[in-house]
């Protein structure tokens, strides 16, 4: 995917759901994966021409899984003129030591807490997650199969008990487009060393949708359109 196409799709989502206002300071959550680096590239570049003036910072919460090297991410941030902060934690070793049964949800909760705290400390009023179009559909499927309810995450959410709004500017971008952009612009993806990476319920949902598309081409796009048409969870 070309950079201009990325800008176009992100701007469409930002405008449709009024994600950015004048004076916003947005903290971008950087895991080092393809999605978060693509979001970083988009929001950093759009500062040059988007009519509403805003600023961004990048934050990585290092959970203490192995020896993950974010030096190339730091170089990318410097090239994009984006301040970058790494928050060191011992989240993963502590969870392993306690032998937590539901480690993934608890890890996510602790990471989000550390990220939100850093965002507020840096003077941010918004945070940005790199959930893309496929994530919306996968969450929709998982909610029905695992929870028995019709639900997915919203493009914009106010975080209760905080002064932060959460925005998801990549919701019009497919995972395939993110993957293509990452290759085309050689983004410095950091390998995820978490031992349960790729063995989650979301990966199962991803495979289910892939099989569905073999039988029903464009199934994901049509599910996404249904979510929007029925205004499910703020869409």
Predicted regions and their residues:
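Alpha-helical structural motif
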Residues: 2, 6, 69, 174, ...
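Residue-level detector of flexible, active-site-proximal loop/helix-junction positions
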Residues: 63-65, 91-93, 157-160, 173, ...
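Catalytic subdomain that performs nucleotidyl-dependent activation
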Residues: 56, 126, 134-214
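Generic detection of long, well-ordered alpha-helical segments
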Residues: 33, 131, 213, 217-220
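A short, charged, Gly/Pro-tolerant segment at domain boundaries
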Residues: 200, 206, 218-235
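ATP-dependent adenylation/nucleotidyltransferase module used to activate substrates
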Residues: 1-139, 146-149, 176-184
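A short, amphipathic alpha-helical segment
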Residues: 11, 15, 44, 210-213, ...
